[in-house]
């Protein structure tokens, strides 16, 4: 009998595997044996986990296509691409402070019975919304910095101090085209209150609320935001020694400001609610850019599909796509 080539041996063994899947075959040649192991693995595909993942992905794509076909806005009504989210020790007291200091309007609250912790609340300040909740073991209290655009810096500064805030610096005209002041609220959050002094101010396009970061190194944060969220850098003021004193990036329809940590302005990792057209794709991009998962993407009872990540600098991003309108409960 003529000796079979390696190719002929492999063809014969693969044919046997297909006809009799349970057959144990021991080829004489080691190189053929390695290929047979691959053939045995492939014979078992698609595995159940592969099928389940494929089905879930197809269902998600179908749901999103249906939502897009109905012209559902991927951003929930009243929100922008980015909405700050405060995790507080004493959320009810903070809401009262925001009403007195900033003229805030409470839109929505989910609170445990008998004056228990606030699980979620939404407050409107000017043209923007800020979300908040009482801290819990999973999400302890954290402090954030926020720019607050107003029509009268001095009046808002005075009201904030009267409501219990601590001054950081009093109102003053600045050479970058603003009159500004800053305070710290009772929860430790910084508020940079400002009014543009001219139409050419670099802050002219800012809304009532804009999150402000104080990273140790701003360029790394900017590059992460570009890779993860498609951010566009729109402004950078950098000194000859490389310190970034102020920068702005645009994500969707929103701005995130930042200036590198110095003096009393130290890193304050924040929580941001980010609306995007495809939460799953953005979540995966963020992980590839270096973020770690907090919560996998899933459909939520309030009509969003969302998940969460933490970037390499400690900021938490809850990434969402609005899928359907749900009446508040």
Describe the predicted segments one by one.
Residues 1-21:
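Charged, compositionally biased N-terminal leader segments and the immediate start
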Residues 14-46, 58-69:
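Short alpha-helical interface segments
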Residues 70-77, 81-90, 119-124, 135-206, 245, 250, ...:
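Vicinal oxygen chelate
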Residues 100-107, 165-166, 227-234, 290-292:
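Conserved acetyl-CoA-binding loop of GNAT-fold acetyltransferases
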């Amino acid at each position: 009998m003529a000796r079979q080539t390696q190719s002929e041996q492999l063809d014969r063994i693969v044919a046997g595997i297909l006809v009799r899947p349970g057959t144990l075959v021991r080829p004489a040649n080691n190189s053929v044996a390695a290929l047979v192991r691959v053939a045995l693995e492939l014979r078992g595909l698609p595995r159940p986990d592969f099928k389940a993942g494929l089905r879930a992905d197809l269902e998600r794509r179908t749901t999103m296509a249906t939502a897009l076909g109905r012209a559902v806005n991927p951003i929930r009504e009243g929100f922008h691409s980015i909405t700050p989210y405060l995790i507080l020790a004493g959320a009810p007291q903070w809401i009262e402070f925001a009403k007195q200091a900033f003229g805030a309007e409470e839109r929505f609250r989910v609170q445990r019975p008998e004056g228990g912790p606030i699980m979620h609340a939404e407050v409107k300040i000017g043209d923007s919304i800020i979300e908040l909740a009482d801290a819990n073991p999973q999400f302890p209290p954290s402090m954030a910095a926020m720019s607050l655009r107003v029509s009268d810096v001095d009046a808002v500064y005075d009201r904030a101090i009267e409501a219990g805030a601590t001054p950081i610096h009093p109102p003053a005209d600045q050479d970058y085209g603003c009159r500004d002041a800053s305070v710290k609220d009772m929860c430790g959050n910084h508020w940079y209150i400002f009014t543009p002094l001219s139409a050419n101010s670099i802050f002219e396009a800012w809304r009532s609320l804009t999150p402000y970061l104080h990273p140790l190194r701003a360029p790394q944060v900017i590059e992460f935001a570009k890779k993860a969220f498609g951010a566009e850098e729109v402004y950078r003021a950098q000194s000859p020694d490389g310190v970034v004193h102020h920068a702005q990036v645009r994500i969707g329809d929103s701005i995130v400001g930042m200036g590198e940590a110095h003096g009393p302005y130290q890193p304050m990792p924040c929580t941001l609610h980010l609306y995007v057209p495809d939460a799953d794709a953005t979540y995966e991009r963020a992980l590839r850019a270096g973020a770690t998962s907090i919560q996998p993407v899933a459909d939520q009872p309030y009509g969003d599909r969302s998940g969460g990540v933490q970037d390499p600098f400690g900021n938490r991003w809850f990434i969402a796509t609005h899928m359907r309108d749900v009446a508040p409960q």
